[in-house]
Amino acid sequence: GADGALLFEEDVLCRIFGAYSRFETLKGIALVSRAGYGSTSMDYAFFDNRDYTSFKSLTLRASAMDSIYTRIRDILIQGLLEDGGSILPTQAYVQVVLYINGEYWGVYNLREKVNKYFLAQRYGLADPEKIDILVGNGVSLTAEDGAGNSDSGYLDYKALVEYAGSHDLSDASNYAYVCSLMDVENFAEYCAMEIYVGNTDTGNIKFWRSEQLDNKWRWIPYDFDWAFNREDGSTSITYTTGYRRDFFTKYLHPDGHGASKGFSTVLVRALLQNSSFRALFLEKCALMLQIFDTDTMIARIDELSANIKEEMAYDTAKWGVIRFVTWETRVEGLRESAKNAPEYFLYYAQQYFGLSDAEMTEIFGRRSSLTGVS
């Protein structure tokens, strides 16, 4: 606790967690309860905003690719989504300082781990084993349970995409069939969110379904370490101009999305041919402007960065990957995004959908103050 008192103690399995972040200096660590270690769950109220206090697994994340930039990018976005009333299932977090065998290891975020147990808790599902999860690693899509592309969930999802791509979804019956297989409100909100935050790692995805609910596919907000100002496929970071990019065209590109455009956009583009879904999607875009309101976002950036500012001085001194002043500059880059992203989002929304000024006012309350972007 704050006074140094021990709050929780348990023997758990610890293992390196993540994909490309395994190559970072500060690696993610998964904490997993195992009966062989004494307990099948970690029973403690780790997160103030969760009404459940039993966890099969947790993660300690140093923000992966954001570990040398701000250390708060992912928790910033997920926290604002949750507080803003998003229907997307976000991961709870607590900012912590990690010691390993008594050695100072630096600033981490304790997080819920996105898996079948996480979903069972969030949605009140009795049997975690009756949950299908599909995952993307930035390159390909597969089933999380190890069954790979022979998994029934993978095959069913592939069939859904093929149907959407080969049928006119402006037709009410065709659209209704697709709606019977996926939660279109969840999907519309997920896509609008990815575009607003300018995520350049959109291929790192997780989505799921369960017969215990309605067996519809739903998407999970996951891994925003490359959001806001990150340039895909490049080691260079533009901290004051990254928000200027047209993420509507990027995310909805016919060739695909993700760092290598390896993920199909057939489903979302087919759905956008339906006027009802198009209206829903634009409604969700308007919601993102509310959730990521400039003042709200800057206040949260200030809060999260202040929480770790003192520790980041020690952290940067220990690892030497970046200087403390560089961290401060990069946090300021997030503030710049908060100030400028709304206008560019509005501008590109109007350009992509060909909306009139009157339609912009009806949907968003206003049009962008920008008159042109070069």
Q: Which residues are covered by each model-predicted region?
A:
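Generic low-polarity alpha-helical segments
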Residues: 31, 81, 341, 373-374
